[in-house]
Design a protein with these regions (language model features):
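Von Willebrand factor type A / integrin I
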Residues: 1-34, 40, 171-177, 189-296
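An amphipathic, basic-hydrophobic helix/alpha-beta surface used to engage anionic
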Residues: 1-138, 178, 182, 188, ...
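A short, mixed-charge helix-start or loop-turn motif at secondary-structure junctions
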Residues: 90-94, 151, 243
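Short, electropositive alpha-helical surface patch
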Residues: 135-149, 290-291
Length: 296
């Protein structure tokens, strides 16, 4: 399936995603930078766009391609965002139009397109119990094509170890920026909170999109159901049960789980947004981006 949805992009592109904390970068003034007078290093090219400084046109690149290109430097991105996408087996679940992974991948692609449109650098890490793919943040159109290619090839399959992945990602991100985590968060929460603390200690702004299927929240089944640990492999535990017998207790436990994550994030100054796969993604994202603008 295509993860770039024109209707979603039309809703969110005019809004944009702005950093609410001080980040490293200083070009267009959308984000404040704590760094002034730092040295810059050539990183890449992008095609010329109206309003760009003509002094920065690369004439050699024009001679090679017959297209106008602007030189990009490492310090030129207003925001460096790294998107962490959960591709563990639990993300395969879904009885509606999309699985959790398909919904999350659509969100990832939409965020990447929006960030690159506003000339910010975006990177991607796809993970399960380890890091499957890694792209360092770059602010070019070619980066979006790479991200889409990785999303289309990703296969949610193994267990989750979000805390270990967050530790590795923290060591790979060299400069302060934004880290966006897109996951169902069905993982060890203590390790997850430790990972959040490390990222915050390193100066990153964190945004969490928690993706759940409505079934996981409501447990709507009426008939007898065989429940199976989707990340347990061939030896997964199974339970044949009548959902009505424990629906109330299950929903209370799930409400406590979601509430705890939301409270911990709020106290730490971290944005946490719960998204159900039945939610209109474009509408939910536009509401969130509007709320960030009001709170910025």
């Amino acid at each position: 399936m295509s993860y770039l949805n024109p209707e979603i992009l039309a809703r969110i592109m005019p809004l944009g995603l702005r950093a609410q904390r001080v980040v490293e970068g200083s070009i267009s003034g959308l984000h404040r930078s704590p760094l002034h007078g730092v040295s810059v290093e050539f990183a890449n090219y992008r095609e010329y766009a109206p309003g760009d400084d003509l002094k920065r046109l690369d004439w050699r690149a024009y001679a090679r391609s017959n297209k106008f290109h602007i030189k990009l430097y490492e310090e030129e991105s207003d925001l460096r965002a790294t998107l962490l996408l959960d591709a563990s087996a639990s993300m395969r679940y879904g009885r509606g139009a999309m699985t959790k992974f398909q919904y999350a991948a659509t969100l990832t692609a939409s965020l990447a397109a929006m960030l690159i449109r506003q000339r910010d650098a975006v990177g991607l890490a796809v993970f399960d119990e380890a890091e499957q793919s890694w792209l360092r943040p770059v602010a070019t159109q070619a980066q979006l094509a790479k991200i889409i290619d990785i999303l289309e090839k990703a296969q949610p399959d193994r267990k989750t170890d979000l805390s270990a992945v967050m530790g590795k990602i923290a060591s790979q991100i060299k400069r302060r920026g934004m880290v966006v985590i897109i996951s169902d968060l069905l993982t060890d929460l203590d390790g997850f909170y430790d990972g959040l603390s490390r990222l915050q200690h390193d100066g990153h702004e964190i945004v969490i999109f928690q993706i759940l299927d409505p079934d996981e929240i409501e447990l709507p089944f009426q008939d007898s159901v065989l429940f199976r640990d989707i990340e347990g492999g061939a030896s997964a535990e199974q339970l044949f049960a009548e959902p009505w017998a424990f629906r109330k207790a299950y929903k209370a436990a799930m409400e406590t789980f979601i509430g705890e994550v939301d409270t911990r994030c709020r106290l730490a100054g971290i944005d946490h947004l719960l998204l159900r796969t039945s939610d209109d993604l474009g509408l939910a994202m536009s509401h969130y981006l509007h709320s960030r603008q009001r709170g910025a």
